[in-house]
């Protein structure tokens, strides 16, 4: 088979699991529960479901439709919809590229912690051990410090796994890997949930997780948080889903696929919250630490609070720690391979390269950039760049995509394409949810955050460093335009 022939999924199940794998990431495990807890508890599920129905599913259908209609990755797909729009697809791909350059390092933290846990068990002081022994964090942004060689080697190992999966192609790589990773990941989370539910104090933690505060529904920030969580959780704006849908066969129910992927992703997040809060409830019960002092998100939860909680388990504490970090590694890798595939497929389409050559080119760039985040100041760099990459680049990429596909090409044309293939028919309402409601909300999210940064700065960093982080936005625009102007290099 010539490498110019487009690959395809061997089954719809493979496509579903790969799409779910792209959506389920580290944030589903360590961020969603905290979002629920801090935004009205069970009441948060109301704006969350509204966001899923009004933005999440409509935009996922849009990305599936673009990919399936054009049979191209994001840059050439948007160019096919409207001449001169290739750069908007590259903008999405570059956004994902920037995020992956440090996301893989976070996966490396999880992998390294997993190895340490298997060999040595839990550290006596998880906070000091993680920040000073593992990350070897420096005093600030100005102090780059040394390289954490354990993290560097782990980062290269993660890149090796990603390369191994993607080099095998769609059917034998992405599809087979996700058919193993996603069911196993679900199994690991169910183990953590079942264990959490048997612990004393667990119900108190779960009550904190789900008890509704309906007054939160009158706070617009809660609604914006719900829409932001849905948008980022479903891997929208990366160009991933466009690329994945381009590998679907001609007859594919795009609407059912979008609904299935969205519900599985959200269901996984909700389930993981029981594991997190049930275990934290137990820690509060045994140690006397108030639950509101124990609850945290992101890095603090994953590498400090949760290991401390698991170390207190009456039995098999190390085993459940291994299960937790193994789940993080699987969730991270399933997302990482999807974002890298968005870049690889775009290069294959644009430059007519073989998969292995395109993958080699992409990995070479990543291996040059990622080590920056393994230095002593790496966590600070990651924090600043992530704020602007995930908070600005992705929403802007999605807004550009919506303008091209819905308003310049025609939402009705894509709706007709979807309806020919799907049992659930889309009405005109879909065009307005995807084409009007979604960009308004995404613009509001970007505008409000920009207002906060302009008035209060970000994270206590000096203005110089915040501006430096924000420069990735114009940089992404410039590189996108350059890539559009580059010519195909056949047979390189």
Curated annotation (Swiss-Prot):
CDD domains: SLC6sbd_u1 (cd10334). Belongs to the sodium:neurotransmitter symporter (SNF) (TC 2.A.22) family. SUPFAM superfamilies: SNF-like (SSF161070). The keyword Transport applies. This is Uncharacterized sodium-dependent transporter MJ1319. GO terms for biological process: sodium ion transmembrane transport. The chain crosses the membrane at residues 13-33, 42-62, 97-117, 150-170, 180-200, 222-242, 258-278, 320-340, 359-379, 391-411, 428-448, 463-483. Its main location: membrane. One of its GO terms (cellular component) is plasma membrane. Putative sodium-dependent transporter. GO terms for molecular function: symporter activity. The keyword Magnesium does not apply.
């Amino acid at each position: 088979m010539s490498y110019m022939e487009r690959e395809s999924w061997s089954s719809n199940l493979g496509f579903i699991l790969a799409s779910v794998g792209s959506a389920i990431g580290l944030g589903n495990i360590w961020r969603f529960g905290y979002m629920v807890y801090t935004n009205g508890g069970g009441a948060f599920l109301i704006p969350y479901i509204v966001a899923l129905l009004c933005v999440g599913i409509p935009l996922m259908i849009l990305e599936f439709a673009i990919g399936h209609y054009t049979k191209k990755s994001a840059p050439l797909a948007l160019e096919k919809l409207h001449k001169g729009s290739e750069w908007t697809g590259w903008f999405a791909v570059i956004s994902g590229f920037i995020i992956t350059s440090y996301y893989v390092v976070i996966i490396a933290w999880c992998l390294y912690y997993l190895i340490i846990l298997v060999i040595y068990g839990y550290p006596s002081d998880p906070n000091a051990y993680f920040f000073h022994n593992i990350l070897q964090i420096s005093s600030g942004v100005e102090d780059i410090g040394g390289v954490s060689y354990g993290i560097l080697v782990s980062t290269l190992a993660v890149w090796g796994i990603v390369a191994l999966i993607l080099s095998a192609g769609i059917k034998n790589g992405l599809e087979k890997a996700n058919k193993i990773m996603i069911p196993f990941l679900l199994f690991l989370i169910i183990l953590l949930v079942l264990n959490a539910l048997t612990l004393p104090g667990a119900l108190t933690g779960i009550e904190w997780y789900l008890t509704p505060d309906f007054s939160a529904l009158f706070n617009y920030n809660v609604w914006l948080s719900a829409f932001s969580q849905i948008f980022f959780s479903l891997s929208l704006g990366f160009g991933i889903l466009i690329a994945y849908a381009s590998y679907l066969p001609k007859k594919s129910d795009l609407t059912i696929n979008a609904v299935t992927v969205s519900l599985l992703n959200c269901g996984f997040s909700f389930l993981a919250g029981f594991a997190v809060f049930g275990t934290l409830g137990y820690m509060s019960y045994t140690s006397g630490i108030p639950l509101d002092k124990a609850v945290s998100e992101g890095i603090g939860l994953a590498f400090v609070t949760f290991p401390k909680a698991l170390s207190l388990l009456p039995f098999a504490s190390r085993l459940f720690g291994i299960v937790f970090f193994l789940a993080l590694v699987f969730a991270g890798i399933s997302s990482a391979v999807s974002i890298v595939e968005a870049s690889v497929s775009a290069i294959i389409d644009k430059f007519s390269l073989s998969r292995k050559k395109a993958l080699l080119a992409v990995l070479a760039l990543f291996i040059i950039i990622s080590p920056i985040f393994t230095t002593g100041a790496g966590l600070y760099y990651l924090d600043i760049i992530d704020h602007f990459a995930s908070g600005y680049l992705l929403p802007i990429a999605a807004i550009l995509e919506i303008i091209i596909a819905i308003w310049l090409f025609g939402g009705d044309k894509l709706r007709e394409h979807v309806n020919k293939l799907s049992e659930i028919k889309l009405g005109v309402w879909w065009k307005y949810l995807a084409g009007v409601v979604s960009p308004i909300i995404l613009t509001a999210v970007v505008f409000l955050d920009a207002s906060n940064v302009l008035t209060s700065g970000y994270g206590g960093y000096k203005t110089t460093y915040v501006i430096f982080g924000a420069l990735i936005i114009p940089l992404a625009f410039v590189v996108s335009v350059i890539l559009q102007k580059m010519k195909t290099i056949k047979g390189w």
